[in-house]
Design a protein with these regions (language model features):
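Contiguous, well-folded functional domains in the mature portion of proteins
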Residues: 2-232
């Protein structure tokens, strides 16, 4: 009996030593992880503040810029003197997760609001983008033609597409401010429902909106998406 007790005691001491060592390891790991987590949270907060200072606001999982006007086909417009600069909004950028080629309109070309003027090749599919306003194309972004990935990486900045001289002042009726933000947020919700109900793809709940890559869709599914959201 005494020998059994000694064995049990020895096992207990051994297990206690292991548990103590594991506890020390966990404490050390936690001590190392907390500063890393704090740094990650701080970086995220700094990035959010920087985007806020630049005029970006969240809108249902996509980014909205306060200084722009927005058209139904998910393009933005920025007045620059007597010209209007045109680019893709963040929801269009989500639908087109990457681009391998961009065909822009020609300089001097007359464009009409609602008619396709840009063709983007993305993920094995093509998407046509409608002009937000009627007028004459007076400038093209050569950078985005050479480097189509700018449409994804900087859609509100260096990824702009072309500038147009409007034929009239009807562009002033485009959505802006809180009205535009509310519309874009509604469009983000509509896109999530569309993917789930019509195409059977579940999008992430909360946080950043993530659309299904075009390459994973059939041709008819892709046409449904572009008709419903890019209006082409």
């Amino acid at each position: 009996m005494g020998m059994i007790l000694e064995v049990i005691t020895g096992i207990g001491v051994f297990l206690a030593g292991i548990i103590a060592r594991l506890g020390i390891v966990l404490v050390v790991m936690l001590a190392l992880a907390l500063p890393i987590l704090a740094i990650a949270v701080a970086i995220r907060g700094i990035r959010a503040l920087r985007l806020w200072a630049q005029g970006f606001r969240p809108a249902g999982g996509v980014r909205f810029h306060t200084g722009l006007l927005y058209a139904a086909g998910h393009t933005w417009v920025r007045p620059e003197g007597d010209r209007l600069r045109v680019g893709l909004d963040d929801l269009a950028e989500k639908i087109l997760p990457w681009a391998v080629a961009v065909a822009l309109p020609a300089l001097g070309q007359k464009v009409k609001a609602g008619e396709p003027v840009v063709t983007i090749s993305a993920g094995g599919r093509e998407a046509r983008v409608a002009a937000p306003v009627s007028g004459t194309v007076v400038m093209l972004n050569a950078s985005v033609a050479r480097e189509p990935t700018l449409l994804k990486s900087d859609s509100y900045g260096r990824g702009w597409m072309y500038s147009v001289e409007p034929e009239d002042r009807s562009w002033r009726k485009l959505l802006t401010g809180e009205e535009a933000r509310s519309w874009l947020q509604g469009e983000a919700s509509r896109l999530a429902r569309f993917y789930e109900e019509r195409l059977g793809y579940a999008m992430a709940d909360g946080g950043e909106l993530r659309a299904e890559p075009p390459v994973l869709m059939g041709e008819e599914e892709w046409k449904e998406v572009t008709r419903a959201f890019l209006r082409t």
